[in-house]
Amino acid sequence: DIIVDDASLDVPAAWTRIEKNNGYGRSYLVLNPTSEKQTLRYPFEVKSDGKYEIYTYFIRRGESSKMTELVVSDGNEQKGVVLNADEIEVLGQTSGEWVSLGEYNLQSGKPGYVEFTNNGTITGQICADAVLLVRK
């Protein structure tokens, strides 16, 4: 498995790091509502070719947007994914849950990424925490 956590990223100025233990790891990132397009990229590279399921750790906050827009790149193509907060069930006493972004054929030497974006239209906060790749 490969995990890319927010702690390993160069964070754009519009995003705020929240130092709390209610996400994956010790922190997560928040983007407040803005009309300016903002993105945050979680880059990854696999060491062996194969099919991988990609997840993100979804954090539910009272101020969160109902929709979170992402772009997943397998190193060749990009695919848009929209997470609807109303369709994600957070179980137990956590404030988040691993949510699948789909299965992708990934190749060694072809870096990919998961990118969070607001497209300048989101009305609530966007939370970004971690990305997980699990080989199938």
Question: Residues of each region from the PLM?
Answer:
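Extracytoplasmic
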Residues: 1-136
